[in-house]
Amino acid sequence: MNLAVIGINYNNTPIDIREKVSFSKSQKYKACTYLIKKGISEIIIVSTCNRSEIYICSDEIDSHINEVVNFYKIFFNVESVNEYIFIKKDKEAVSHIYNVSAGLDSMILGEDQILGQVKEALRYSMENKFSRKVLNKLFREAITSAKKIKSELKISETPISMVYIAIKLLEKNIGTLKGKKACIIGAGDMGRLALKHLINEELEEIFVANRTYNNVIDLLKEFPKIKLIDYEKKYEILDNVDILITATAAPHLIIKKEQLQNIKQELYIMDLALPRDVEKSAGDIENIHLYDVDDFKNISDSNKIKREELSLIAKDSIDSYVNEFNQWMKSLKVDNTIKDLNNRCRDIKDEYLGYITKKIDLNERDKEILEKMLFGALKKVVKEPILNLKELKDEDEINKYIKSVNELFKF
């Protein structure tokens, strides 16, 4: 079994492409189902506003990497996506998910939300049986190591997130938010986080709209001061607010330029969604100040030097965790070969036990003794080779001997 991650992320991919290859829940299910049918053993998809990554485990890794690359282009109908796709195999793939989980590969270095997103990606694949032993262990270990690294190095001592940066950008442009009015569209994790930040800023009014009304009712219980508005009437409130934050999971635009043309006051729009919620050209309107996820990168750079120093320190810890996982992967290869050898011994034992019992009439006790003796003798023959296999450390040697055993025994 080999591992790989194939995908795109903010490092070299503009938002115009990222939003086109972002997986909705239904798309994630279709993608995993399709790729499993193509022979890939295990799949986990991590899809956020900054990355779209497919982690795979396979016996035919190179051909299945090509399968995933072609899948991206065909599934999303984006011809140019190949220009941006990155591929990492085995140890590099393992290192990548460890860095991602710890927030060390994030646009906002050390941000907190990615760990929850990685957990959700694992939960989804486990629940739908798209991942099994290898990827489940990889993601669990990555999550555990991320918690340790964040705690040990205090990378997230001050909670940092895309929402936090967006609020800081608002403060930079508006000054104090006290007495301002805001509207949040979207009551998911991002919208809820935005609300928590705004509640602390002493705004005059905060309006919340969401397509599913029940989700907003739950928010009202937690934040009784907010005012709920009907999703279909969201445009009517925009004349009366200073700030609009959008954070929906809609696959299409929910705010278009033409619907903002008559806004008279200065309106700051923070589009936290991917695909984007707000039409890009809306920012061309003189009194509309539109920001999307890529605009938040610059404001986070003030923390960058300190956080990059911490990420260099974290590298040693991550390397250690990666090496531990790779040792487990090596032992897994050996374990499969040992299992094959034991199964071959069992098959030979069953074959000869059947032959003997046809020739000699044995009672149940004698038959049981003979079975144990046959199986014990056969296992003794392979015991030393098995012990030698377990002691191998070098990956090339492991692969060489496993290949030889497989060829000799025709596994």
From Swiss-Prot:
Keyword terms: NADP, Oxidoreductase, Porphyrin biosynthesis
Annotated positions for site Important for activity: H96
Catalysed reactions listed for this entry: (S)-4-amino-5-oxopentanoate + tRNA(Glu) + NADP(+) = L-glutamyl-tRNA(Glu) + NADPH + H(+)
Enzyme Commission code: 1.2.1.70
Subunit note: Homodimer.
UniProt cross-references to HAMAP family, sorted A to Z: Glu_tRNA_reductase (MF_00087)
Family: Belongs to the glutamyl-tRNA reductase family.
Misc remark: During catalysis, the active site Cys acts as a nucleophile attacking the alpha-carbonyl group of tRNA-bound glutamate with the formation of a thioester intermediate between enzyme and glutamate, and the concomitant release of tRNA(Glu). The thioester intermediate is finally reduced by direct hydride transfer from NADPH, to form the product GSA.
Name recorded for this polypeptide: Glutamyl-tRNA reductase
Species this chain originates from: Clostridium novyi (strain NT)
Lineage of the species this protein comes from: Bacteria, Bacillati, Bacillota, Clostridia, Eubacteriales
GN (gene name): hemA
